[in-house]
Amino acid sequence: MIPEDHLQYIRIGLASPEQIRSWAERRLPNGELIGRVSKPYTIHYQTHKPEKDGLFCERVFGPIKSGVCACGKYQGTISTKDSPKYCEKCGVEFTEARVRRHRMGYIDLQCPVTHVWYLKNRPSVIARLLNQPLQDIESLVYYDSFLARPVTNEPTLIRLLPTQSKLYKDRSQSTFDKPLELFLFDEPWQSALSNFFSPKWFHLIQIREMLTGADVIHKLLSGLNLTNAMFHARNQWKHLAKKAPESQSEVIEAQGPVPQAEEEKQRDQSIQQQKDAVLRRITLIRDLLQSQTQPEWMVLRTLPVLPPDLRPILELKDGQLIRSDLNELYRRVLYRNQLICQFSVEDPFCISMMQKKLLQQAIDSLLANGAGGNIIRDRNMRPYKSLSDIIKGKKGRFRENLLGKRVDYSGRSVIVVGPYLSLYQCGLPREMAIELFQPFVIRGLIINHFARNPRAAKSMIQRRHPIVWKILKMIVDDHLVILNRAPTLHRLGVQAFQPVLVRERAIHLHPLVCTGFNADFDGDQMAVHVPLSLEAQAEAHLLMSPYFNLLSPGTGDAIVVPTQDMLLGLYALTLGATLGIYSNINTYKYQSDVSFTQKTDSKIITFSNFSDALTAYHQGIITSDLPIWLYCRPEIAVMNNSQGDCPVEAQYQPKGIYLNVYEHSQIRTDKLGKTVQKYIRTTAGRAVLNQQIEQAIQGTEHAYKAVKQLNIILN
């Protein structure tokens, strides 16, 4: 086992048979090698003690009680320099009982077995790697067909048979990969052949010339050179690329009758599908080369056995035993593994072939119950939980126990919408914040001389002294929190926010960041974590802020975009007359109790700056859709509806000042044509939106400046 302090990362992948053995095999001081599970037994039905060499064997997995051997010769003995390291009689090592939680065993399989994850999953890794149809691969794995074994370079007996017995016939085959020549077991010539030869010689012919089962897949995968396969796959892709049209215009401009153009389209689609398949195969081979994984490891010759404490047998008070489903599935594998040895002596081919098929199905059920065929059930017709069922889903080992652990300085609550928040802010409940930041609050109370010791500070926190909230407010202003929503499917599921204390018990979240979390406000919950170290806080500032997660990492598209009620709100806020100065703001096509604008016969109000317009809006003097004339800087360009920008009205004023009135603007120029004054026709709602956009841009600029300064300090 790797020491915990040396563990830097975990990588899930294929393991070689030698590596699986190294996980479980140990050598006793007398030279005996242990670790192999050979008997399909768990515990004795009377004594409830583990059976030797069974699934709960103490020699293989360690003692049930610390320092107590299986035979009872030694009681409470822990291995030291002077005491023996194991019991000479039963072979149990003197060690702690907790080793049964991580010590593994292994089953030495009597025949190769294909890993169902790499065979049955869509897409099938084995079928893609061998570049063969999945149907043909499955017929070989489950002993429905066979290959003619190439014993010599000369034609074999089966290869001289008529070609109509080939299962693989008239299939579109690739340029560089030959299809498999498969033969069915129920062909008429087989019965005639068995009558011609004696049973002994017929069995020898079958062994000599028929190759089937996972042994075929192992030979094909072990004979596969990944480097050459990559070279051929790339050449195949180039060959297909030459067949494809250079542009879509060649298809559109095709001359001749319509059926001919339709055939060309179908041919191009077929070529594109072949190119996609070859590209996926290239990607798979590249991943195998980079991870230094051998393809033949997808066929199991050694099956690892989980530690017994991960598949326990528990005894209730009334004496009833509760067993893990994995124990029954392991027993089924061991039973069928033993039967192969027994029948291989009596019948070298037929019966042993059926036993190998049963072993393949048993291991399929152990790894993924139901993937290889029928679902195995218990007496109550409840399906057994396989390894796949244990580790997948919300209640699986990863999401329930490993990723879903309770951690310190974390909390969880329901999320609600917080439209008043900035993009980088979140509303944190005060009761949750006082618990998350309690050590920081205690330190703040002591430093500011409000408490003499931690005990007095905790007492103030429990009494909710008013000064506690002020200290907490100072702390959260300088500290980010990390929000996470399960399942974390991509890095946007974990982002850092500046907390804002709220009195409610729900977490307030800005609606624009919901897309990254895949969250909505119908009862979803989110977890809050507090980064403690300086490195974690710097990473939260530099990498995890919503300002630096505006684009999707998968597609590159903008992920922070307004949707639904935000778009309706922006539309209502910026709603105004669209006909310029010709529109009659007092005329509406409909009447309602609550109108957007109060009817008035006054002229359009003129404002000299944004502040006056916003003040009038907030005081209720004007409404959001009431047209106003608003002063703007002369250098700001104004977009008019007319193509030629012709003024609707032109006035000549004293001192040579010209006033040109357009549909959406008024421009005053001097004698030299220089713009002196400019007013734009807009609404108070659009002025509010403009102010919000300016503040957001300024906030982003300040954030980038802060990041640059922090980078300079760190470097």
UniProtKB/Swiss-Prot annotation:
Tell me the segments the record calls region Disordered: 244-272
The protein's matches in SUPFAM superfamilies, at most eight in alphabetical order, are given as: beta and beta-prime subunits of DNA dependent RNA-polymerase
Cofactor dependence is on: Mg(2+); Zn(2+)
What EC number(s) does this enzyme carry? Answer: 2.7.7.6
Write down the Gene3D superfamilies for this protein, in alphabetical order.
Answer: 1.10.40.90, 2.40.40.20, RNA polymerase II, clamp domain, RNA polymerase Rpb1, domain 3
Among its keywords, does the record have Transferase? yes
Per the record, what is one GO cellular component?
DNA-directed RNA polymerase complex
Protein location? Plastid, Chloroplast
Q: Which residues form a coiled coil?
A: none
Molecular-function GO term, any one: zinc ion binding
Question: Entry's Pfam families?
Answer: RNA_pol_Rpb1_1, RNA_pol_Rpb1_2
Give a yes or no for keyword Zinc in this entry: yes
Name the residues that bind Mg(2+). Answer: D520, D522, D524
Keywords carried by this UniProt record? Chloroplast, DNA-directed RNA polymerase, Magnesium, Metal-binding, Nucleotidyltransferase, Plastid, Transcription, Transferase, Zinc
What domain of life? Eukaryota
| Catalysed reactions, semicolon-separated | RNA(n) + a ribonucleoside 5'-triphosphate = RNA(n+1) + diphosphate
Q: What GO terms describe the biological role, i.e. biological process, of this protein?
A: DNA-templated transcription
Could you tell me what the cofactor note in this record states? Binds 1 Mg(2+) ion per subunit.
Q: Which SMART domains match?
A: RPOLA_N
Q: Which residues bind Zn(2+)?
A: C69, C71, C87, C90
Top enzyme class: transferase
State what this protein does. Answer: DNA-dependent RNA polymerase catalyzes the transcription of DNA into RNA using the four ribonucleoside triphosphates as substrates.
| Entry similarity comment | Belongs to the RNA polymerase beta' chain family. RpoC1 subfamily.
Q: Which HAMAP family match?
A: RNApol_bact_RpoC1
Q: How does it assemble?
A: In plastids the minimal PEP RNA polymerase catalytic core is composed of four subunits: alpha, beta, beta', and beta''. When a (nuclear-encoded) sigma factor is associated with the core the holoenzyme is formed, which can initiate transcription.
Question: What is the protein's given name?
Answer: DNA-directed RNA polymerase subunit beta'
Q: Give the originating organism.
A: Zygnema circumcarinatum
User: Gene for this protein?
Assistant: rpoC1
